[in-house]
């Protein structure tokens, strides 16, 4: 899918369900909307805090892959400086 843009003029990941991980240990799974100087905007987002949950990040991802995104927030903006990595959820090996 690399290089294919669903909507010309939008980010390559626009409309794709992604796993976004931060340096602080937060993981977001949601539909990628856009990215600008303020950060990445996600829609219909599930959030996992590795420090505040009994559930490991790996189990959070496995459950999401199996049952779908359990939406915690309708939208989230993750500041660019906090993003460790972001990519399609479908690329994650669970």
Annotated model-derived regions:
Residues 2-94:
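Conserved RNA-binding domains used in RNP assembly and mRNA/RNA metabolism
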């Amino acid at each position: 899918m690399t290089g294919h843009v669903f909507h010309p003029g939008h980010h390559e990941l626009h409309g794709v369900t992604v796993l976004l991980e931060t340096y602080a240990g937060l993981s977001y799974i949601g539909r990628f909307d856009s990215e600008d100087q303020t950060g990445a905007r996600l829609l219909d987002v599930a959030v996992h805090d590795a420090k505040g949950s009994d559930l490991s990040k790996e189990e959070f991802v496995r459950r999401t892959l199996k049952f779908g995104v359990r939406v915690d927030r309708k939208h989230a903006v993750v500041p660019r400086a906090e993003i460790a990595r972001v990519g399609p959820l479908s690329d994650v090996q669970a």
